[in-house]
Curated annotation (Swiss-Prot):
The lineage of its organism: Eukaryota, Metazoa, Ecdysozoa, Nematoda, Chromadorea. Belongs to the IMPDH/GMPR family. This is Inosine-5'-monophosphate dehydrogenase. The keyword Oxidoreductase applies. Its EC number is 1.1.1.205. Keywords: CBS domain, Cytoplasm, GMP biosynthesis, Metal-binding, NAD, Oxidoreductase, Potassium, Purine biosynthesis, Repeat. NAD(+) binds at D292, S293, S294, G342, M343, G344. Disulfide bonds: none annotated. The active site is at C349, R448.
Amino acid sequence: MVRPEDFNSLELDNSLTDGETVHEMMAHKAGLTYNDFNILPGFINFGVHDVSLETNITKDLKIKAPLVSSPMDTVTESGMAIVMALYGGIGIIHGNFPKPEDQAAEVLKVKRFKQGYVMQPHCLSRDSTAFDMIQIKKKYGYTGAPVTEDGRVGSKLIGMVTSRDFDFITMDVAGQKGTPISDTNDVTPTTPITRIMVSVDQLHLGHINDAPELSQKKLKEHRLGKLPIVNDNGELCALLCRSDLLKARDYPMASYDSKGQLLCGAAVNTRGESQYTVDRVVEAGVDVLIIDSSNGSSTYQISMLRYIKEKHPHVQVIAGNVVTRAQAKLLIDQGADGLRIGMGSGSICITQDVMAVGRAQGTAVYDVARYANQRGIPIVADGGIRDVGYITKAISLGASAVMMGGLLAATTEAPGEYFWGPGGVRVKKYRGMGSLDAMEAHASSQDRYFTAESDQIKVAQGVSATMKDRGSCHKFIPYLIRGVQHGMQDIGVRSLRDFREKVDNGIVKFERRSTNAQLEGGVHSLHSFEKRLY
């Protein structure tokens, strides 16, 4: 039987050595990106399910998948952060909100999330009509909705519209309000929802303070599809859904804190006023703070880092962004628990073009990781992740995890509404936090790039764009995880720690790619093709 050590001994035989070590590859000093190299295959003697992706993103914060969603206002709010944590990663809530309390509220939604619970269900109000329910069904696919006094979560629950109330109600093709939608009971689009709904006194209810097991038992005993969750005042707090409860069995890798709540991060800028924001999100239960700045080596970053470590020493802090070892040393010396690496490498970032400052992401990750890892500080590679293979490459260069923006934009869980773009393509808006759109939305985005709100001339370091619909993260994230596992299996490593050790020891070999090699490695020589990834 062939043993892995037999294969490794062949690799160490100079006459049979292919490629070069990572240190040899990076010794040429030219700026390398992820696309400039490949990793050579190793020996496989284990299954893909045996590959562990557990990693640390700070000294004390561990996650089960090396995936972090970027704190951008078109990428991460509570919906994205919840999904990221369910699949073993972590989401970082962006800071481009009108008020600090709004960001804290998003953190709370993540921390209060319970398996099967919908914390922000679409509600109808007392003044809603049958037409409004039909629109919710058409737009979101929901077959029922709670009815509250003013149509919001937190308002008094007065009833529930279920699929049974709408089973025989249909719209005409045009969806005109004057067209009858039922031949029975004289129900029309203008029929008040209060006439159709099941009133609250006829509903089975759960209480917000009940243990999840108790509410789930009530749902099962009464064979309910949905169970409204209320507080002592009868105000709607959440909706427990049978379909979502069944999905809960599919998250064995979920990232939890010591209290059994999902992990969640938040981004804060370097302005002095942001100390109030820090206090609010920490109060909400945030697990890690990211100090959000395009250039992390500044007096402003150091001041914010010191404030957080002095006022909230239990909270982990990822500082950045940095791309050099000198920058890394500065922030580690000031108490950073993790570092965020990248400057100008994101798909919507134009910093390198406009400011003439930045660094190729592959080289930045390698150089900073070599120094930071010696000091026990994990790094998160931020930017330049185009596909699943780039995640594996970032890890090979020393990253503990990758941060994704464009890769997650236009998923169902990303903030914003879909719309139809040119050619009938379903798209969502995606913008860099250094774009004029983001800066005009709120001042906190300007602070990331050291731009004052009063400045009449603003220099954009990002663009606004649209991204094609990627579908739900419930399909996309598992694809990314399994893709990384397959890549590591091909390399012959069982874990990220094993990967890092074999890279450092020169067992894992690399090869730089010529321009033609890059073309050859992609789809080519075809008349037409369809690229379906998952």
